[in-house]
Amino acid sequence: MYWDINLTGIGEGSKVEPYIMNYQQVQDNGSYNMFGCRADLKRNSILFEGEFAMQSSRRIKANILSLNLGYKADQFNWLKSLTAGLDIVSGDDPGTDDLEGFSKYFGARHKHHGYYDYGLHKKYFGHTHEGLQELNLKGRFNFLADSNLLVAVHNFSSHDGKTAYGNELDLIIKRKVSDDLSSEFGLVFY
């Protein structure tokens, strides 16, 4: 189940999206209930995007948290927005009988965690992974004719912070050609 609740009193385009899902596998130990809520809030130049979800069953106890706070800079020609973010995907503790790794079986998995396809921080099928803790800073800038430049810095580690996966710098140029077509070119340093 999914609800889309507009919060126009906060700002145009603001909404929350609570959801409930019951996922069933043939093997009972992989089935779980998921409860969560996404929020996309805009107030003047301040932007907030967040999500929290829990997966729960007899053996599964996992969660995810995503917080992004941004500033939309309408008064500058060259700067579009600045955003700081934190993503925490719970990881499994092999010392317990419970499965604590959050499964992104139905989600974007690695899509929002930088561009580099680094194996250690993109494996979120199932519940036995180390999880992820990501800090990021992003700036979107007007660049050349009708193009945008995204500069993003990411810091990745396991959920418990014991395994450092590394840092990433993204430089991405995007140009909208029409309503149906855009091009994207980028460099990624890991």
Question: Across the structure, where does each feature detected by a protein language model lie?
Answer:
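Residues that define the transmembrane beta-barrel architecture of outer-membrane proteins
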Residues: 1, 31-35, 42-44, 61-65, ...
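C-terminal amphipathic "assembly/sorting" segment characterized by alternating charged
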Residues: 134-190
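Transmembrane beta-strands of outer-membrane beta-barrel pores
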Residues: 20-26, 43, 52-56, 73, ...
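Extracellular/periplasmic loop regions
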Residues: 47, 51-52, 60-142, 148-150
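Solvent-exposed loop/turn segments connecting transmembrane beta-strands
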Residues: 24-31, 55-61, 129, 159-165
